[in-house]
Amino acid sequence: MGKRLLLDCTLRDGGYINDWEFGHDNMVNIFEHVVGSGVDCIEIGYLNGSSSFNPDRSMMPDTASVQTIFGQLDRKNTMVLGMIDFETCDIKNLQPCEESCLDGIRVTFKKDRLVPAMAFCREVKALGYQVFFQLASITGYSDEELLEVCRLTNDVKPYALSIVDTYGLMEPDDLEHVAGILDAGLDPDITLGFHAHNNLQLGYINTATVLALETERDVLVDGSLYGMGKSAGNAPLELVALYMNEHCGKHYEITRMQEAIVTSVMDFQRITPWGYQLTYYIAAANRVHPNYVRYLMDERTLPVTAINEILQRIPDDQKLEKNRQLIEQLYADWRKEACDDAERIVKREYET
């Protein structure tokens, strides 16, 4: 078995809850406690060229901003990473790695941007950073497309390639299938990663599934403190760490994570709760983007059976998009059909 590694993404994915406005003291506190717990990697936020520097926010315009906020902190033996959503941060915003406190950059991209994203990753790697490929919306890839991903990835030779279950749609069998293809196709020195979302409450078990893979490859899994993150949240870092201590021979200090939760996370949870919600469950059950469900539920006149019926009419190639015009048209069509059916019933009753 290869090494089993843990990455904390609280300051990045957790930012969807508070618009990345953690506050400087909380950012430092989370960093110091998570690093002190012994995690292998910590992601300190997003690099986004359209944002302006704010010491209270973990959405930063460039690596110089990262250096200002985190550069003087004791990183111990933890790999420090930032994330770029492809095409939101120009390469000129990145200093050479030797001038930065970042060890690596995770680049997330969707299938239709695969080739240009990998070209960008080459540029990032040329600056000296460890590069991580984040395959967003992994459920949108066919087996053949995953094999092509392996071919292109082997050519760039990143540190890691991660399966990203963006909408929390995967079950353990799905995950084992995808991981098996990637494990067989990737060069052996490329780490296989996994990032879960908890829409179907499977984030923890899916993460454990990846950790239990029979592979000589290194495996890296993500978690966030108290599961703080987009939609229904992520796999909770403290639970994954406990599992890894018990099953992977790790020695993470769970108490340090708990302290960070109490001092820097719970206040955000009280203001904007995350976790299991009907909206995200219905979206995941129908394999569609949550925005479609939000639109239909905001109408407040539709029974759940009607919501499911309308969602099932979304074409496969639009299920994970955010096509407002499409869902409006499907809703209008459903209403017309419902009205026509009601008129026919009334007419039939009148005639009898």
Task: Identify the residue ranges that each predicted region occupies.
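Catalytic cores and adjacent flexible loops of soluble metabolic enzymes
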Residues: M1-T352
